Amino acid sequence: MENSLKSSGKPLAAPKVGMVSLGCPKALVDSEQIITQLRAEGYEISGTYDGADLVVVNTCGFIDEAVQESLDAIGEALAENGKVIVTGCLGAKKSASGSGLIAEVHPKVLAVTGPHAVGEVMQAVHSHLPKPHDPFVDLVPAAGIKLTPRHYAYLKISEGCNHRCSFCIIPSMRGELVSRPVAEVMLEAENLFKSGVKELLVISQDTSAYGVDVKYRTGFWNGRPLKTRMTELVGALGELAAQYGAWVRLHYVYPYPHVDEIIPMMAQGPLKGHVLPYLDVPFQHAHPEVLKRMKRLANAERVLERVQKWREICPDLTIRSTFIAGFPGETDAQFETLLDFIREAELDRVGCFAYSPVEGASANALDGALPDDVREARRARFMEVAEEVSAARIARKIGKTLKVLIDEVNAEGGIGRTAADAPEIDGVVYVEPAAKASKRYKVGEFVSVKITGADGHDLWGEV
């Protein structure tokens, strides 16, 4: 155990952080990672209490003696410096009353996190000791380098996938599911909103599985515990979006049961209008035998019931999905079941691919491969039905006034999107020019648009 910070009369004005590291080698590695990240972001490390702008204390809570030593170290840091962030095993320990032990003994600490929490520690450091941004020196903005327009951005929350769909080789390329630490995700989201992003598109290979690999481990954000789980993450992102008047849109939502918990957030309460009533759910097919061969969830009737229940709770819900037509062994009757599902579910936006073998996919070994012309004919027929359903749903929006995010401004007015439209893959709204110069639209702003027309894909409207 080491506490190398001592008092000296050498005050420094630069952003400097002191580090007290206690506990086992695993805790020492955590401290090394924190220091590495601090240095990577331009902070300096102070060897004295009074030479530091704040102090991070990495604690141990394994045995009573270690608990007391950690509490004493926190007290010393508070007395010598006054600004203290606490991390490590003791951060997760409760007192006899059930509250956090550290907060009860030392209520003046700035923030408390658990172990393995580099992201949470850095978020706390940023909150209490912001790193000055010098545009002449710093090459990378806090939000990172983005290839999307300034007003929307993608937020990847995990990598890899635990499914073994027979038509897919993603797990062999990207590996098993690895969820990003929840504080790291939240920090990136906050930086994006601060940079002017008005729409955050949450993506992964399987958004619904977020946190499964870490058993929904509890992290910390803004001084409060936050589970590494989709439901809790969406709620926290929605709260953050509300602070900045922004949107959160969910993509690649595999229809696990806990997805039902998200729907009320979209329909009511303070998150309504921020967690968008939009789900991108990759159903892929509707016949149980085909789904079984795909190694997908096979209870299509249950899925249809859930879709209908979602719409009862949230009538404005937009559902986008993707499907595969002509999968090996798909019969005419099974394909008709798929078309019936599209009609009954009234999906708003769909894409369909004619099945095509992918090198390395287990589906290549399935019997019943269909000729190319049959696969393509089924894809075309599917899209005919899907477009009929979509056109009918879009037509219901005529006469309504909708919130539109402007993506482009030109001589003909503006082009934007509603809550029902993700960029690049869904429709757009063509907005007539503003009547007055002072009312001209700006890219990245929200405007209220009265819908005056529609086709099978896009809308037209006026302010």
Curated annotation (Swiss-Prot):
It comes from Burkholderia mallei (strain ATCC 23344). Keywords: 4Fe-4S, Cytoplasm, Iron, Iron-sulfur, Metal-binding, S-adenosyl-L-methionine, Transferase. The keyword S-adenosyl-L-methionine applies. Residues 15-130 form the MTTase N-terminal domain. It comes from the Bacteria. One of its GO terms (cellular component) is cytosol. The keyword ATP-binding does not apply. Its EC number is 2.8.4.4. Residues 395-463 form the TRAM domain. NCBIfam families: 30S ribosomal protein S12 methylthiotransferase RimO, MiaB/RimO family radical SAM methylthiotransferase. [4Fe-4S] cluster 2 binds at C161, C165, C168. It catalyses: L-aspartate(89)-[ribosomal protein uS12]-hydrogen + (sulfur carrier)-SH + AH2 + 2 S-adenosyl-L-methionine = 3-methylsulfanyl-L-aspartate(89)-[ribosomal protein uS12]-hydrogen + (sulfur carrier)-H + 5'-deoxyadenosine + L-methionine + A + S-adenosyl-L-homocysteine + 2 H(+). The lineage of its organism: Bacteria, Pseudomonadati, Pseudomonadota, Betaproteobacteria, Burkholderiales. Its cofactor is [4Fe-4S] cluster. This is Ribosomal protein uS12 methylthiotransferase RimO. Binds 2 [4Fe-4S] clusters. One cluster is coordinated with 3 cysteines and an exchangeable S-adenosyl-L-methionine.
